[in-house]
Amino acid sequence: MSRVCQVTGKRPVTGNNRSHALNATKRRFLPNLHSHRFWVESEKRFVTLRVSAKGMRIIDKKGIETVLSELRARGEKY
């Protein structure tokens, strides 16, 4: 399963670890992803989404119905 937020599209980015001596070693910054079940009242069922913390805040703000309609418009499976 890829580490991509289904709502925001956040994905891992690359950067460097920096030691005290400023040696650079490659690393990945991973998004804060969680599998979360959301109740969809219109469908009378739970929908499981893999979302970041920011994605959960967007769902709280817009509502799950609106977010799911945006996912459908993008052709995203959920």
Swiss-Prot record:
Is Ribosomal protein set as a keyword in this record?
yes
Biological process GO annotation list?
translation
Coiled coil segments of this chain: none
Name any one GO molecular function.
Answer: structural constituent of ribosome
Pfam families in the record, alphabetically?
A: Ribosomal_L28
Give the record's keywords alphabetically. Answer: Ribonucleoprotein, Ribosomal protein
- Give each disulfide bond as a residue pair: none
- Write down the InterPro entries for this protein, in alphabetical order: Ribosomal_bL28 (IPR026569), Ribosomal_bL28/bL31-like_sf (IPR034704), Ribosomal_bL28_bact-type (IPR001383), Ribosomal_bL28_sf (IPR037147)
The UniProt entry's GO CC annotations, sorted and at most eight, read:
cytosolic large ribosomal subunit
| Source organism, top-level taxon | Bacteria
Family listed: Belongs to the bacterial ribosomal protein bL28 family.
PANTHER family assigned: 39S RIBOSOMAL PROTEIN L28, MITOCHONDRIAL, LARGE RIBOSOMAL SUBUNIT PROTEIN BL28M
This chain belongs to the protein called: Large ribosomal subunit protein bL28
